[in-house]
Amino acid sequence: MEFPQYRKIDGFGRYYRISDERHFTEVYVLNGQLVTHQVTAEQYPEILRIQDLLNKEFSFVEMTADEIREMFPG
């Protein structure tokens, strides 16, 4: 699998850039501002979350090219 991978929670406004099997960035909009949270998966639940993101489990879906440009500029 090539990285980065991009996912979102369908209908919830949370967006993810997965850099590799142990790192991801979560982005959401709060009061009109992009809020960014970087996560390094060190514990098992975090590692499982990245696997769920990559496998598109639950409500995780791929982001469109327009969404990627909007939520992860630069």
Locate predicted features.
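Low-complexity intrinsically disordered segments
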Residues: 34-74
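Tryptophan-anchored aromatic micro-motifs
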Residues: 6-11
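N-terminal helix-cap/turn-to-beta initiation motif at the start of protein domains
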Residues: 1-5
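Basic/aromatic-rich interaction segments and small domains that mediate binding to polyanionic partners
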Residues: 24-36
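Intrinsically disordered, low-complexity regions
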Residues: 12-14, 33
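Broad, structure-driven detector of short, well-ordered beta-strand segments within folded domains
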Residues: 14-20
